[in-house]
């Protein structure tokens, strides 16, 4: 994510996955901030209050990203009016292609086909024609079966419609790039806040992980001194199962300052 933020700062556009990752961070930031408020209530001030308060969920930005991006594979039709219109035209053109091909498959070309299906080859709608009847179905050959007995032909009747579909696909991709560029610009305006959120969330994650481990180990925070004294109460080796480890008390630096530990040799 830090790499994505650096790219935003130099004016680059982010991909769908990168924008979703930033959106996810901000949504988690919002959840953490809401959790801190619900957990604290009217309790006494906490040492983490400042970190929680510094979090900025940037809700308008996350809302806009979620409105435009449905998943890592799909941009919403509602991302822009242009995209909605382009996709509507693609559907209309696709329906016209299927209507004409269905008429061929179930009508005049039926006896020349290997199978009554409509397929895609090289991004073009085609029908499977028996090789020996190639001349009976005027069109462009885009592929053939492994045995050579079937040719996948794009009938001349739909060449223009297939071209229209291809042009619409290019328009769709161009519009998606515009949408991602716009979202990237909006995100770039908040890079300082996003980076601050990221740093705080990482710190909180470490703090809570340490606290969870401490609770699991029944550990306490040590108090250090510069007098050369060590006093451990009910200490256990942290890497040994706490159910098997025998706690011991250790005192050094008061009555004696030398400790010899003996162990059985197996």
Regions found by a protein language model. Give the residues of each.
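Amphipathic alpha-helices that form helix-helix packing interfaces
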Residues: 1-4, 8, 22-25, 29-32, ...
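Hydrophobic, well-structured mid-protein blocks that either form specific transmembrane helices
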Residues: 39
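Amphipathic alpha-helical interaction segments
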Residues: 3, 21-24, 196-199, 203
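Conserved, well-structured core domains of diverse proteins
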Residues: 46, 50-54
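Alpha-helical coupling/stalk and coiled-coil linker elements that connect catalytic or binding modules
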Residues: 8-16, 30, 42-46, 62-264
């Amino acid at each position: 994510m830090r790499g994505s933020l650096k790219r935003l700062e130099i004016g680059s556009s982010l991909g769908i996955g990168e924008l979703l990752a930033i959106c996810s961070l901000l949504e988690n930031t919002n959840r953490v901030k809401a959790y801190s408020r619900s957990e604290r209530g009217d309790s006494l001030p906490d040492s983490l209050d400042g970190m929680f308060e510094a979090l900025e969920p940037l809700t308008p930005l996350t809302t806009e990203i979620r409105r435009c991006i449905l998943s890592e594979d799909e941009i919403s039709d509602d991302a822009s009016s242009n995209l909605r219109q382009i996709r509507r035209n693609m559907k209309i053109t696709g329906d016209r292609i299927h209507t004409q091909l269905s008429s061929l498959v179930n009508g005049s070309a039926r006896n020349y086909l290997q199978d009554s299906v409509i397929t895609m080859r090289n991004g073009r709608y085609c029908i499977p024609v028996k090789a020996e009847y190639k001349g009976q179905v005027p069109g462009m050959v885009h592929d053939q079966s492994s045995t050579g007995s079937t040719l996948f032909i794009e009938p001349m009747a739909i060449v223009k419609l297939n071209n229209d579909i291809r042009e619409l696909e290019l328009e769709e991709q161009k519009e998606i790039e515009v949408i991602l560029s716009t979202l990237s610009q909006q995100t770039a305006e908040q890079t300082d806040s996003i980076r601050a959120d990221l740093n705080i969330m990482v710190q909180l994650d470490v703090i809570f992980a340490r606290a969870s481990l401490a609770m699991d180990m029944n550990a306490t925070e040590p108090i250090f001194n510069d007098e050369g004294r060590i006093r451990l109460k009910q200490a256990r080796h942290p890497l040994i199962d706490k159910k098997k480890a025998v706690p011991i008390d250790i005192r050094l630096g008061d009555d004696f300052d030398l400790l010899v530990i003996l162990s059985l040799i197996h």
